[in-house]
């Protein structure tokens, strides 16, 4: 099986990258693993033009297609993301918004292969354990 582990943080050598490396190293014993970092790709924001609803293609020419090719390659996709103000980083959100041409569940044009498994790992760090515990418990 092929596994894609995606660092969804704009910080390429932080805590998220550390988790990506640990997960990737563990999985390499059994699987064909690739790791990518969202910060290595040029991702424009969705313009909300809805052109993709009719054509199944985005009018923007950036690196989103390169990430989708990695998704197509993989049987399992693991997204590892920090929490920024209780949400995902803007870069990851921009990517998700731009996935509409490939995986809009209401669109007959959706082209992402079915049968893939997806997992997510969310990180929360803070200046103290007390702060992290408060977020985890709520």
Language-model segments: residues:
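N-terminal beta1-alpha1-beta2 submodule of the flavodoxin-like/Rossmannoid cofactor-binding fold
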Residues: 1-108
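Short, glycine-/small-residue-rich phosphate/pyrophosphate-handling segment
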Residues: 91, 107-138
